[in-house]
Amino acid sequence: MHGLLLAGLLALPMNVLAHPAEQHASNVLSRRGVDIESFRLPLKAKYMDSDAAAQKIQAMSFSKDDDYVSTATKLVKSTFPKSTFRVVDDHYTGTNGIGHVHFKQTAHGLDIDNSDFNVNIDRDGKVFSFGNSFFTGEIPKENPMVKRAFSDPVKALKGAVKALNLPVKSDNAKAKTTAGKESFEFMGTTGALSAPKANLVYLQKEDGTLALTWRVETDVGDNWLLTYVDAHNSETVHNVVDYVASAEFKVFAWGLNDPTEGNPTSIRDPWTDSSPYTWHSDGMTKYPTTRGNNAIAQDNPTGGSTYINNYRPQSPNLIFNYPWSPTATPPSSYKDFSITQLFYTTNRFHDLLYSFGFNEAAGNFQVNNGNKGGRGNDFAIVNAQDGSGTNNANFATPPDGSPGRMRMYNWTTARPNRDGCLEAGIVIHEYAHGLSNRLCGGPANSGCLNALESGGMGEGWGDFYATAIRLKPRDTKDTNYSMGAWAANNPKGIRAYLYSTNLQTNPYMYTSVNSLREVHQIGTVWATMLYDLMWALIEAHGGTYSANPVFRNGVPQDGRHLAMKLVMDGMALQPCNPNFVQARDAILDADRALTNSANKCTIWKAFAKRGLGYGAKYDARNRTGSNRLPPGC
């Protein structure tokens, strides 16, 4: 079925809503006693979006007969008529029809290495948008190639090795000329994975002047560096670029559900092996923004359906560190923080689910599946502060091969208004709709959770994962949790009862579904049962609150992650549009497949507690409950 399921956090219309943080990964150079952060390039870029670009180019003359590279070249010439530059040989037309052309500024025939101009051309051959970091100061009058009063490249290599304490032996280094102006490769070195290289280039400095430098390239494994060594003083290193990018996010860390549970912290390189291209690449293109193989995050204040040209925070050095405070208003004032948080939570959940088996062949959300099965080109499109609604969120799940779409709204239930992106449980709930709809009935069928009861379970799975992920080391089976409490500004949350193992606190039973007519109500019953199941497995296997599960022979070694794994495996086993009884049986079958039914009786006892025991029967109008256990338990 080539359908599309759109699932929301709440029933509409909505009336009055009466682990520890991850450790930072240290940069390898920092461990050598060198702070690479102090050598980062200065940010010089400006960007003119499509609206601004349309106004600027009205006065410019372009020929309809020009190809997109020629059109882009004319724009650069008209913008910087006195500058010299070259076309970089990497232009292409994207799948969205936008042509991308890049230019490098030059001086005296040498590249100004951090002076770039990028032009985007639309399908009609017109300038769509552009950005640049061209040098606008005074170019040195004297051509350095005339007197050649600059240092030897070998001295530059030795200067880089010394300044950065690199594990490269350069005592016997000799420079060999290679193709390109003042380009060299070093022979006689050891310690680098490939022969170091050097190119004579200019560099824009922070003070607005140009420095003549040797760009020394050294690949030492954990760091692949471009070190800009002053061409007149080899003791001076101006800047360093590391190809082995460390991304840093200032966010509410994984396991913190909302701002009441902690403060934003800086987290570096949080991806796992589940994202082999990191979070900022699809294996073909690296993105200095909140875009990658698994997700693309942006704001969407108009609530429109387009997204590719929407606003995203840009960070060439992948440092996404933006301010936020509980009193900040309106939410748009901290949109950079919001988009970053949404991107982080979405990717973190992707990686966790991947470890459980929601991979390429299972129909997960990725652009590049790396020849591992499934259909690619379907990352999750996640919109922060979406203007199409308030006090809710939703996720649209098309079949595998088409992107999922999450829309996160602002909440008007508090003053100042609150941003749903800052409550991880809401993001996780929405993404879980994509999980359950891709697994139930197979990746190509998005119509297998459309019945009332199966749709209810779709809501329940979202609440279950949101709650399981937020557990803390101090929690016990007596700990209760709400859903959506922070966003809704209501400690009881947005569900009829708290998630609790206590039958007085949460009295829902299987037969409670007989009187319920709305998927979120039914979902609360299902999530309540799964909450009991999780705590039963934690009591049987212990609990760990680390960010990532530990597996042995494919089995999570703690009860919390085991519950998440079994519940997910059950989704793929159950029939299209299942009922509670069938979903329970699928979880039992999942345990059989994974552990040879080692947890059979534990699972039965958890479900029997809520009336979904041995002998419970489904009838749309008159479900029969049972607290019994099967023979052998």
UniProtKB/Swiss-Prot annotation:
<keyword id="KW-0843">Virulence</keyword>
<feature type="binding site">
    <location>
        <position position="429"/>
    </location>
    <ligand>
        <name>Zn(2+)</name>
    </ligand>
</feature>
<keyword id="KW-0964">Secreted</keyword>
<keyword id="KW-0325">Glycoprotein</keyword>
<feature type="signal peptide">
    <location>
        <begin position="1"/>
        <end position="18"/>
    </location>
</feature>
<dbReference type="InterPro" id="IPR011096">
    <property type="entry name" value="FTP_domain"/>
</dbReference>
<feature type="glycosylation site" description="N-linked (GlcNAc...) asparagine">
    <location>
        <position position="410"/>
    </location>
</feature>
<dbReference type="Pfam" id="PF07504">
    <property type="entry name" value="FTP"/>
</dbReference>
<feature type="binding site">
    <location>
        <position position="433"/>
    </location>
    <ligand>
        <name>Zn(2+)</name>
    </ligand>
</feature>
<feature type="glycosylation site" description="N-linked (GlcNAc...) asparagine">
    <location>
        <position position="480"/>
    </location>
</feature>
<feature type="glycosylation site" description="N-linked (GlcNAc...) asparagine">
    <location>
        <position position="622"/>
    </location>
</feature>
<feature type="propeptide">
    <location>
        <begin position="19"/>
        <end position="246"/>
    </location>
</feature>
<feature type="active site">
    <location>
        <position position="430"/>
    </location>
</feature>
<keyword id="KW-0732">Signal</keyword>
<keyword id="KW-0862">Zinc</keyword>
<dbReference type="InterPro" id="IPR050371">
    <property type="entry name" value="Fungal_virulence_M36"/>
</dbReference>
<dbReference type="GO" id="GO:0005576">
    <property type="term" value="C:extracellular region"/>
</dbReference>
<dbReference type="InterPro" id="IPR001842">
    <property type="entry name" value="Peptidase_M36"/>
</dbReference>
<keyword id="KW-0865">Zymogen</keyword>
<keyword id="KW-0479">Metal-binding</keyword>
<dbReference type="GO" id="GO:0004222">
    <property type="term" value="F:metalloendopeptidase activity"/>
</dbReference>
<dbReference type="GO" id="GO:0006508">
    <property type="term" value="P:proteolysis"/>
</dbReference>
<keyword id="KW-0378">Hydrolase</keyword>
<dbReference type="GO" id="GO:0008270">
    <property type="term" value="F:zinc ion binding"/>
</dbReference>
<protein>
    <recommendedName>
        <fullName>Extracellular metalloproteinase 3</fullName>
        <ecNumber>3.4.24.-</ecNumber>
    </recommendedName>
</protein>
<comment type="similarity">
    <text>Belongs to the peptidase M36 family.</text>
</comment>
<dbReference type="InterPro" id="IPR027268">
    <property type="entry name" value="Peptidase_M4/M1_CTD_sf"/>
</dbReference>
<keyword id="KW-0645">Protease</keyword>
<comment type="function">
    <text>Secreted metalloproteinase probably acting as a virulence factor.</text>
</comment>
<dbReference type="Pfam" id="PF02128">
    <property type="entry name" value="Peptidase_M36"/>
</dbReference>
<keyword id="KW-0482">Metalloprotease</keyword>
